[in-house]
């Protein structure tokens, strides 16, 4: 037996170690794992080196028995300890004395653990095909070698050194420098003992030698402004998709969306502070259910530093904002909506990100997530940076985020913001301010491919989840697989045209008649949503009510008539919060809506609210208003050219042959004996009239039932004669009759000349 085997041998730094040690304390060493921890030294013995700048003494102990294997030597007064281990020394831990005379603390050596990164993950990230990179990158609770802690991983290919800094190490970048993975730009480290809600950042020694303290791009939690640290949180459990998701997002389903900014929908009256997710799960969900909306669309909920961005400039894309509560409470809000039969859409910002120092901006000293050239990478209108959609790791980051919100929180779809700014290189740029694509065109080919692929991934991985595009140009095939592959596109053209028409004085509307009909010229080119969104009630544009001309009565009547026209027109519906009760002032994100208006004398606002509630319930209960939105068989103009009277009449149909005739009179003149042709004989029932007194209208109506007469009109053998209320929209419903009833009606009216196609359809 070698009697000298367990005799302590002093650690003698080699000549070249001084430079290494200095770089460790300067936090400039690119790979501390190559030096710290357990390593063989020149005489083929093993040594343990530990960097603890605040420690007084460290013993190397048997991690199983706690027995001291070897006391260490302090080989640098700044706090570097080393011990040469005896042969066949067991696995070790540390017994650290921080102050002389105090009790020692058992700790793990962070540099004794291997990497948790898998080669497959790194390969998929580099290829741009890692569907769920958030399961690998970021901060994740883990157990390694029986020790609990958190594994951290980040992508920073051009960094010289990356460290995890946080509460657990005094924000000291020397303590937890990460392991570099040459070739893929990844860095990782496992830190034992880090707990839930610990604050952290990445300290990045960038490509230019500058220190940048960055929030974790993949963090599941983040501090509320003004502080900017990431928060260690567990990966949310997968959410169960509601059984009705696929049906609710179908192009043949009734979709009526209530767009909500959670911070200003309603506030606590005592302190004007935000409602919590828990309060909203009760108050918002019950309100939306009562009002008859089918979907809630939430403005962006990724953590953002500037309240005035409304969430559209996020720095923590994977971190639900803590303004309103915890991630679990957000999931409970979505669950409450699902329990009420309501789908929830998340406003998702994938086009740009803010320039905040702690965010993605020049993350490792280079344009990592953005383009280096400002002609490609800088958005002049919003002072934000544009994602580099041609970079695989960036595509992974964004596509994974879309999946994350749907799979982990239960959102039923995403609405992608500012798509036009993504797909055009010259968006809001003058000549000379943009770079053409490889073919010389203005399209951003990489962004187009990214959107198409992201939507394909959603369709494959989250069946039934919807994707909605806010796209403001005439870019073709937004909702076609060969195009951008969205499910729906916001019809910004319809919104702009019809609002311009409605802002005209009724006496002038006859000169702008085509603005209300033009939408049908391209209706079947895309699957459309008709949006009256937050963008239309801010920045001096006035509220929807404020846009309406005339005195008080006329303003409210105009708005009710317009809503009726909108709900009858083909396309899914969207109203921003406050529009449903005609809020008079513009939206202010710093205050709750003016709910007190519902209690005002006169009942104007309450009348609009009651009207929208009835509109929603009528819309969802009658298939002619939604089933064939995207098929020509579901729509027919009956009167499209009566510009002198500013009257529009059209028919909506479903597959069963049920009909709803929509009549809108956009003048304050009562039109008596107004006649128009109809396709089917028989009785029609008035199911909606925006001029009813319960809505604060004038009460002009036609009775419950109206019968078609044997009077030709507008090229039809049958016609109706009505009194049209002023500034009003009326819906007439006719249920499809059995063929025998149709034949009887035809004989009674002596009208055999009904088209064979119609007769067969019935």
UniProtKB/Swiss-Prot annotation:
Gene name in the database record: glgB
Transmembrane portions of the chain: none
Protein's name in the database: 1,4-alpha-glucan branching enzyme GlgB
InterPro entries per the UniProt record, alphabetical: A-amylase/branching_C, Branching_enzy, GlgB, GlgB_N, GlgB_N_E_set_prok, Glyco_hydro_13_cat_dom, Glyco_hydro_13_N, Glyco_hydro_b
One GO molecular-function entry: hydrolase activity, hydrolyzing O-glycosyl compounds
UniProt record, GO biological process: glycogen biosynthetic process
EC number per UniProt: 2.4.1.18
Annotated active site: 417, 470
Keywords: Carbohydrate metabolism, Glycogen biosynthesis, Glycogen metabolism, Glycosyltransferase, Transferase
Gene Ontology terms: cellular component: cytosol
Keyword Glycosyltransferase: yes
Lineage, uppermost ranks: Bacteria, Pseudomonadati, Pseudomonadota, Betaproteobacteria, Neisseriales
